[in-house]
Amino acid sequence: MAIAYAREGADVVVSYLSEDSDAAEVKRHVEDAGRRAVLIKGDLADAQHCRDVIATAVDQLGGIDILVNNAAYQMTRTSLADIPDDEWDRTFDTNIRAMFHLCKAAVPHLKPGSSIIGSSSVNSDMPSPTLAPYAATKAAIANFCASLAQLLGEQGIRVNSVAPGPIWTPLIPSTMPPEKVANFGSDTPLGRAGQPAELAPVYVLLASDAGSYISGARVAVTGGRPIL
C-alpha cells in the first residue's frame, strides 16, 4: 500500500516490526516513485510506539493526510483451550488497540479532506472458527471505523474500512498449517487468492479526491465472497 500511495504522489511513513529487508525494499520502491519514505521500527502493540509513529509523521513530513491501519496478527487454533491468554491479548493489542492509539494521536493533526482507513476482513462477517481472536478484532475494526465516520464527519474527516478476503501476504505462510496454505483462496468464487497489488487500489481510492463522498463504508475485496 505504501508503494501504491507513493505512485500517486504521497510521501509515506511505514511502521514495521522486525522485517528490515522488507522495509528497505518498500523504501526503495517508494523512492523509485520519486517520493520520500520514513521507516520506523517498533511494535504497534505498544501504545507509545503508536504515538511516536504519528509524531514522526508530523515532524518529518509536515503533517498527516491519510492514516492506514493495516497491522495484523493471527494464529490458527483448532480449539478454544489451545489459545494462550497472551496470544489473545497480542491479537487484540496489534489489531484493534493499536488502531485506537494511532487514531487518537492522529486526529488532532488531520485537516478537512483527510482520510482514515482500517483493514477489516471477510472474517468480520464470516468468522473462521480457527481464527476466533483475529475474526473478533476484524469485526471490531469495522465497527470502530463506522463509529469514527459519524464522530469525525463534522471535521471533514472520512473514515472507511476495507474487508479483504484471502490475500497473499507473509502473514499467511507464517501463521497457517502447510495444508491450508497450499489451497489458500481456492474456495472463493474466483477460485484463487488475491495479490496485494489487487487490493491496494481500493485504499488509494478511499484516500483520494475521487472518494470524497465515501465515508462510513466497508469495501469488500473478497474474490466473490459477498458481505451483505
Regions found by a protein language model. Give the residues of each.
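Substrate-binding pocket helix/loop in short-chain dehydrogenase/reductase
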Residues: 78-80, 84-92, 180, 184
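Active-site helix of classical SDR
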Residues: 103, 137, 145
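Residue(s) in the substrate-gating loop at a strand-loop-helix junction
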Residues: 121
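Canonical Rossmann dinucleotide-binding motif of NAD(H)/NADP(H)-dependent dehydrogenases/reductases
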Residues: 1-13
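The beta1-alpha1 cofactor-binding region of Rossmann-like NAD(H)/NADP(H)-dependent oxidoreductases
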Residues: 20, 41-54, 85, 197-198
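Short C-terminal tail/terminal secondary-structure segment
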Residues: 77, 126, 186, 190, ...
